[in-house]
Amino acid sequence: MQTLHALLRDIPAPDAEAMARAQQHIDGLLKPPGSLGRLETLAVQLAGMPGLNGTPQVGEKAVLVMCADHGVWDEGVAVSPKIVTAIQAANMTRGTTGVCVLAAQAGAKVHVIDVGIDAEPIPGVVNMRVARGCGNIAVGPAMSRLQAEALLLEVSRYTCDLAQRGVTLFGVGELGMANTTPAAAMVSVFTGSDAKEVVGIGANLPPSRIDNKVDVVRRAIAINQPNPRDGIDVLSKVGGFDLVGMTGVMLGAARCGLPVLLDGFLSYSAALAACQIAPAVRPYLIPSHFSAEKGARIALAHLSMEPYLHMAMRLGEGSGAALAMPIVEAACAMFHNMGELAASNIVLPEGNANAT
């Protein structure tokens, strides 16, 4: 049975030769070079992923939604009752939540995964529960390091199993009341930013309660002293089971050489952890949308990412990842279905990259 260390060691590097071939092919399509902008660079990125066999392509699509409750909810950092996590997880099994509707539109399957809901098991939800909610990060660690490592490995294996069954494009999502608080703590730690710069309203927290949320994040970091150079340490001390789960999806997909669409702010925090744990993950991550949450810009700048969509969204659940899946498919369609300049006897002069 593969260990977490072995999984991280075996993440493949992108295929530079395949990327060069893809770029050459794209430059020969019926258009001025570079005129399809980031659609072209996305196709080249996909071509370099070993799990796609040297060409941009999309097979089955899946959005993995990690569901968990958080002990820090007790600090008054969320407006929704904690039970909403379980209620919404059940609604996901019925296909009625935002991510389910958008994923269905994109032709993707939603996998609802319980990694720490504080309720009885829910029919139709995959059970990877570590505990009924994680610890309150304002007074101590979210979980033990062993719990974090075990969950990373379990989710990574689940992701790789889906890849073996034909999934070639993954999206990550989460569900958990109060989870923007640990996400903000993680972003603060990884980027060296003060909590005031990265704490936002989450799921409509009143402005009058923002200062308390900022204070909670600062206390969590001061009490737990997470090491920003150790991604697992940060996850276990100031993260949460859902954030660990999303990180595990990224590690597993990268191990299989396959792309992962990020969602919003919560997924940015998990991406920061994943890239700290295994920098080789970075080429497999695709930013979907620019979250409206306050700390989004800082997190994305640290990741050196520019999302494809600006929709003022902050729902979470994987909704942005699902919404961006057709963009990935469009990059593949461009690559495979456009005609070639040579076949039409068109010779473009050099310097036409900006032509329209």
Swiss-Prot record:
EC number(s) stated in the UniProt entry for this protein: 2.4.2.21
GO molecular function: nicotinate-nucleotide-dimethylbenzimidazole phosphoribosyltransferase activity; nucleotide binding
Reaction(s) the record says it catalyses: 5,6-dimethylbenzimidazole + nicotinate beta-D-ribonucleotide = alpha-ribazole 5'-phosphate + nicotinate + H(+)
Residues reported in the UniProt entry to bind nicotinate beta-D-ribonucleotide: E174, L175, G176, M177, A178, N179, T180, A203, F265, S291, R314, L315
Keyword Transmembrane helix: no
Top-level division of the source organism's lineage: Bacteria
Keywords, sorted A to Z: Cobalamin biosynthesis, Glycosyltransferase, Nucleotide-binding, Transferase
Biological-process GO terms, alphabetical: cobalamin biosynthetic process
Keyword Transferase appears in the UniProt entry: yes
CDD domains: DMB-PRT_CobT (cd02439)
Gene3D superfamilies for this protein: 1.10.1610.10, 3.40.50.10210
Site residues (Important for substrate positioning, might be proton acceptor), renumbered to this chain: E174, E317
Binding sites annotated in the UniProt record for substrate: Q88
InterPro entries registered for this protein in UniProt: Nict_dMeBzImd_PRibTrfase, Nict_dMeBzImd_PRibTrfase_bact, Nict_dMeBzImd_PRibTrfase_N, Nict_dMeBzImd_PRibTrfase_sf
Effect of E317A: Decreases specific activity for DMB and adenine about 50-fold; crystals bind substrate less well. Decreases specific activity 1600- to 15000-fold
Pathway(s) annotated for this protein in UniProt: Nucleoside biosynthesis; alpha-ribazole biosynthesis; alpha-ribazole from 5,6-dimethylbenzimidazole: step 1/2
Function of the protein: Catalyzes the synthesis of alpha-ribazole-5'-phosphate from nicotinate mononucleotide (NAMN) and 5,6-dimethylbenzimidazole (DMB). Able to use a variety of other nucleotide bases as substrate to create alternative lower ligands for cobamide.
Other noteworthy facts: In vitro assays of this enzyme are performed at pH 10 because at physiological pH (7.0) its activity is undetectable; this makes it difficult to assess the role of mutagenesis of potential proton acceptor active site residues (Glu-174 and Glu-317).
The protein's assembly and partners: Homodimer.
Similarity comment: family membership: Belongs to the CobT family.
Protein's recorded name: Nicotinate-nucleotide--dimethylbenzimidazole phosphoribosyltransferase
Originating organism: Salmonella typhimurium (strain LT2 / SGSC1412 / ATCC 700720)
